[in-house]
């Protein structure tokens, strides 16, 4: 069973969801290079500083925290395969099968990488994440994290600390979805952005209460639709 097995983004749940939480190989080194050996296993999505991770070590400025695991892509064919990170503190680079998939800076924001073109058509795939967290030495937002906890400050947390998951989507898929209810006007405004805006994509919005449809409307991507 995965830690935190629930779908992390219920407003855009897809059936192709594959949870990558669980044991990963890890190593803490002084280099950004792929480690020659692994220090053991870390339980993602808990930071190495947390007891729940099974590690209990503090990542120091200048050190690199490496994660590694194998995975099988979501079932199905065609479309795109997206790799989602709920959050990684602070800066990271991600490789799939030895090729750079992308990176991210900022410890509090989710990010997504399209890894379709990096996948092997058969067999298992490898995922490597290299992380740095210059707590106390950089200009990044840190809240109350510090390497010298005390008073209102708590120990710094590093690395992957939110769910990691895969999903398979169509070539043109819903990228962002915003639902704005207006109780007084008795309307719901639905804002949908697709991955390839401007295409001839029809969208259908349905509002249900207790299993009963109370409103529905059609529209196109990049357009607002109000259901009354």
Give each language-model segment a name.
Residues 81, 186-192:
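Structural beta-strand segments of beta-rich domains
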Residues 20-45:
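Predominantly extracellular/luminal regions of secreted and cell-surface proteins
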Residues 5-11, 25-31, 57, 61-174, ...:
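Accessory beta-strand-rich segments of carbohydrate-active enzymes
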Residues 180-186:
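Short, solvent-exposed loop/linker segments at the N-terminal edge
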Residues 44-48, 151:
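The feature marks proteins involved in alpha-glucan
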């Amino acid at each position: 069973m995965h830690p935190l097995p629930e779908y992390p983004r219920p407003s855009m749940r897809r059936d192709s969801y594959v949870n990558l939480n669980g044991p990963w190989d890890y190593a803490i080194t002084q280099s950004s290079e792929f480690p020659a050996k692994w220090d053991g296993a870390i339980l993602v999505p808990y930071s190495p500083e947390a007891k729940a991770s099974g590690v209990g070590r503090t990542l120091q400025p200048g050190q690199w925290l490496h994660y590694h695991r194998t995975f099988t892509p979501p079932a199905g064919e065609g479309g795109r395969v997206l790799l989602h990170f709920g959050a990684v503190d602070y800066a990271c680079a991600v490789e799939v099968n030895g090729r750079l998939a992308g990176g991210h800076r900022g410890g509090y924001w989710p990010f997504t990488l399209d890894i379709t073109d990096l996948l092997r058509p058969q067999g298992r795939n490898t995922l490597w994440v290299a992380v740095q967290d210059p707590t106390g030495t950089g200009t990044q937002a840190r809240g109350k994290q510090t390497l010298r906890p005390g008073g209102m400050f708590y120990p710094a947390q590093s690395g992957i600390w939110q769910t990691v998951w895969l999903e398979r989507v169509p070539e043109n898929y819903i990228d962002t979805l915003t639902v704005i209810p207006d109780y007084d006007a008795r309307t719901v405004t639905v804002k949908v952005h697709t991955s390839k805006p401007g295409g001839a994509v029809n969208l259908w919005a349905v509002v249900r209460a207790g299993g009963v449809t109370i409103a529905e409307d059609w529209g196109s991507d990049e357009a607002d639709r109000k259901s009354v």
